[in-house]
UniProtKB/Swiss-Prot annotation:
Belongs to the metallophosphoesterase superfamily. MPPE1 family. A divalent metal cation 2 binds at D74, D116, H247, H303. This is Metallophosphoesterase 1. The chain crosses the membrane at residues 27-47, 354-374. GO terms for biological process: endoplasmic reticulum to Golgi vesicle-mediated transport; GPI anchor biosynthetic process. It is found in: Endoplasmic reticulum-Golgi intermediate compartment membrane. It is an enzyme of class 3 (hydrolase). GO terms for cellular component: endoplasmic reticulum exit site; endoplasmic reticulum-Golgi intermediate compartment membrane; Golgi apparatus. It is a multi-pass membrane protein. Metallophosphoesterase that catalyzes the removal of a side-chain ethanolamine-phosphate (EtNP) from the second mannose of the GPI-anchor protein intermediate. Participates in the glycan remodeling steps of GPI-anchor maturation to allow an efficient transport of GPI-anchor proteins from the endoplasmic reticulum to the Golgi.
Length: 394
């Protein structure tokens, strides 16, 4: 009798031990997959990104300083109306990890977000705006050595007939109202492209007047109005054609000439763009090119990549969305800029499909592990499983 009891206790001990081993295996697999998909994958993918090299002619016997800038667009932080909590959690964690990893690995000096920071800024209440802003500041936190500049987008203040002084002031109170500034000898102009409707509305007229004043300052710095009294007391900007940053792209008929893995899907590229909705109007685009004479234009809004050469030789780069919510393969632009030259490269983030496939593969592996433990696999699979285990133990 004592021998039988001893045998039962030993059997129970082995069963308990096997269950503990199974639980340990399951825990290790789950934690490993979570760490890889939610943390380490960002380092593995972004580690391949490098700053482009810009030509460095000596200027006065010394090298020109190079500004390292990141350009991203259309983060679309969800609000209280259209934002499901799981959607918020998933997509905001993706953007936070991508941004923080990029800051740590790439060490940019300035980051530009080209509009549509928020998805519901066009109708959010004061409390909803404060909540969305708090989440944004947590996700895109940065050290004092990095500057963050944000361009106004239509989802931040509304389309032309939705925007108001209140929404614009609310946005500028947080992100600043500066339109023209210089960093390391590079001039930047940030445009409220939503206000480029051209219908003479108060906000539109003020925006155009501000751009004409910026044009005058740039002309004074480039000594194109020599001897003019209006330039006598004007502080000179660096002698450099500006980089134009805005949310809406300049006018183009469609994305038909755009290419690349992050361009719009082939079936959408030939769909004509609507002026003042998908892109700026022809007239507004011509005004910006004439007033500012930019050497480079960067825009967002379309959520897809495109490169366009405008009349006069001004190149425009449309930056894809930074969020999985808008595309499977988000990316951002890395720019090395001097006062006379620039070089751009693209840095891709992890694809959402890759992460989901990894989770599905891990779930299938866990299922096989559990079925093998309880010997519920078909005989052929069970034989193969035992064969693999015996081979690994050698």
């Amino acid at each position: 009798m004592a021998l039988v009891r001893w045998g039962l206790r030993r059997q129970n001990f082995h069963l308990l031990r096997r269950r503990r081993v199974l639980l340990l295996k399951l825990t290790v697999v789950v934690i490993s997959v979570l760490l890889f998909c939610e943390y380490f994958i960002y380092y593995l993918v972004l580690f391949r990104c490098h700053w482009p090299e810009v030509k460095m002619p000596a200027r006065g016997g010394r090298q020109e300083p190079v500004l390292k800038a990141m350009f991203l667009a259309d983060t679309h932080l969800l609000g209280e109306i259209r934002g499901h909590w799981l959607d918020k959690l998933r997509r905001e964690w993706q953007m936070e990890r991508a941004f923080q990893t990029a800051l740590w690995l790439l060490q940019p000096e300035v980051v530009f977000i080209l509009g549509d920071v928020f998805d519901e800024g066009k109708w959010s209440s004061a409390q909803a705006w404060a909540d969305d802003l708090h989440r944004f500041q947590r996700m895109f936190r940065h050290g004092s050595h990095v500057q963050l500049k944000v361009v106004i987008g239509n989802h931040d203040i509304g389309f032309h007939y939705q925007m108001s002084k209140y929404r614009i002031n609310r946005f500028e109170k947080v992100f600043g109202s500066e339109r023209l500034f210089s960093l390391k000898g590079v001039n930047f102009v940030m445009v409220n492209s939503v206000a480029m409707e051209g219908d003479g509305c108060t906000i539109c007229s003020e925006a155009e007047a501000e751009l004409r004043e910026i044009s005058r300052k740039l002309n004074c710095s480039q000594e194109q109005v020599q001897g003019s009294s209006q330039c006598d007391h004007e502080p000179r900007l660096p002698l450099s054609a500006p980089v134009l940053l805005q949310h809406y792209p300049l006018y183009r008929a469609s994305d038909a000439n755009c290419s690349g893995e992050d361009a719009a899907p082939p079936e959408e590229r030939s769909v004509p763009f609507e002026e003042k909705y998908d892109v700026l109007s022809r007239e507004a685009s011509q005004k910006l090119l004439w007033w500012l004479r930019p050497r480079l234009i960067l825009s967002g809004h379309t959520h897809s990549a495109c490169e366009v050469l405008h009349p006069g030789g001004a190149p425009e780069v449309s930056v894809p969305s930074f969020s999985w919510r808008n595309r499977n393969n988000p990316s951002f632009i890395m720019g090395s800029l001097t006062s006379r030259d620039y070089a751009l490269s693209k840095c891709y983030l992890p694809c959402e499909d890759t992460v989901l496939t990894t989770y599905c593969a891990a779930a299938a592996f866990l299922l096989v592990l559990i079925l093998a433990h309880f010997e519920r696999l078909p005989s052929s699979f069970l034989f193969g499983w035992k064969l693999c285990r015996s081979h690994l133990r050698r």
